[in-house]
Structure formats: C-alpha cells, structure tokens
Regions:
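Conserved ABC ATPase "signature" region
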Residues: 101, 108-126, 178
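Conserved signature/switch motifs of ABC ATPase nucleotide-binding domains
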Residues: 129-132, 150
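Hydrophobic anchor residue at the start of the ABC signature
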Residues: 144
C-alpha cells in the first residue's frame, strides 16, 4: 500500500472569467522510501502541488491521503524551501532544533541531536554561528538538517538548490543522495533540472505546462546506492534526451504564457 496517495487533485485560484487552474486532476502515489521528483516548466503547478501535500494549501477538489487517512495538516511532512528561512537571531543549532523545542525536548538533548544532524551535512563546526555568518550553501545545509531532525514521514523539497552556485549545487545533490539512501527517507522533490531528477529520483513525474497535469511517469532504473558518476553514462544521457523530448513543447508553451 502506498504511503501517500494524491487522488484527482485540482487547484484553482480566483473565480469566474479570472479563474486560473494551476493543477488539473493530478493523481499520484508515493511508496515508502521512494524519492519522487516533480519535473516541469515554470508555472506548471509543481510547487502548488507540494503545498497541497504539505497541508499549506487546500485543493479545489480531490484529496491527499497518508496511510489511507486524509491529510488535514502538515504535521507528518516537513518542507525544505529554495531559501532556508532560518531565524536570524537564533544560533544554527537552535534553528535546527526548533521542531524539538516545540515538542518540549530538553535543551541539552535537542542541541545534541541538532549537532548530530549538522554532522551529517558536514557543518557541525558552525553550530554556534548565526545565519548571517554562513554562506548560502551552508545555510541551505542547515535547513536540510532542521528538516531531518524533525524526522518527518515525508520530506518535501521545493527546488532546494536553485539559489546556490553550480559547484555547491553538485555537493548538495550528492549529500542529499547519500542521506536519503542511508536514512530511507520518503521524498517528494520539485526541480526544473532533468539531470537533477535523474540523479536523485526513483521516479519522475513529468508535468505539462499550466494547468499542470501528469504527462508521463518515468521509472529511473539506476540501482541504489547510486553513484553520482552515472551522469556520464550513455544510458543517463539517453534518458535525459527522452525526457527533454517530453518537455520541449511544454517549456515553449509555458514561455509563451509568461
């Protein structure tokens, strides 16, 4: 039985002639431990769908169920955004431990758990720093550590590497690849990058231009644990070209609508 089921979800904004359908009749399932990537052109509803899964946004119709129970809040999922939204006056370890603090976990224990999560991301030496003292990539690592400390059943990631430089992006991709494999996390990951989706995902849901629909579901056949060097293989490049063939027309249509 799937961990998460998205059942005929439609999201619309406004009414009458100004009504805008962002997501149209989307159905998906996500298995336990699966890494599902949502891939599509700008404005196709990827982030909107993720917000519905998180409980931050209500669907116009359809429903989202977790273990057959309808989702009514975001308590069993945690979102990692493009910007990590760290609280500027809190130390990094206190930012990471925020969810534990809200649960009433004692201070010493939550700091210990925060430092352990920061170790996984390679920035434990910066636990006592403040967000303004860290680079963008390090702040994003702290945001990922904060999500891991919360130990959600589903980790939702909305283009988390879009705001960092190319070298940092590659490092973060490799870290997330290793961590999600080692921790057996269930992940829904939004991206514009075909390469990123193929590197990280078990499946890729290719979305159409607005209104966003599922155009294709691609099984990513590369075994796990996955080596980042698969990007250099002929099979990877063939899949990348196949997905671009699916997306080319959608990207052009999205560009005309902006």
């Amino acid at each position: 039985m799937p961990l998460l089921t998205i059942d005929h979800v439609t999201v619309a904004f406004g009414n009458g002639p100004r009504k805008l359908v962002a997501v149209d009749d989307v159905s998906l399932t996500v298995e336990r431990g699966e890494f599902l990537c949502l891939l599509g052109p700008s404005g196709c509803g990827k982030s909107t769908l993720l917000k519905v899964v998180s409980g931050l946004l209500a669907a116009h119709s359809g429903r989202v169920t977790l273990d057959t129970q309808e989702r009514r809040d975001g308590l069993e999922s945690v979102m990692v955004w493009q910007e990590p939204t760290l609280i500027p006056w809190r130390r990094i370890d206190d930012n990471v431990a925020l969810s534990l603090e809200l649960r009433g976990v004692p201070r010493a224990e939550r700091r210990e758990r925060a430092v352990e999560a920061l170790k996984l991301l390679g920035i434990a030496d910066f636990a006592a720093y403040f967000p303004r003292q860290l680079s963008g990539g390090m702040r994003q690592r702290a945001g990922i550590a904060r999500a891991l400390v919360a130990d959600p059943r589903i980790l939702l990631m909305d283009e988390p590497f879009a705001a960092v430089d190319a070298q940092t992006r590659r490092i973060l991709q490799e870290q997330v690849l290793m961590l999600t494999q080692d921790l057996h996390k269930t992940v829904i990951f939004v991206t514009h990058s075909i390469e990123e989706a193929l590197l990280l995902g078990d499946r890729i849901a290719v979305m159409s231009a607005r209104p966003g629909r599922i155009k294709a579901l691609i099984e990513v056949e590369f075994p796990r644990p996955r080596d980042p060097h698969i990007v250099r293989t002929a099979r990877f490049q063939d899949l990348e070209e196949h997905i671009w063939d699916l997306l080319r027309g959608e990207a052009a249509r999205a560009e005309l609508e902006t």
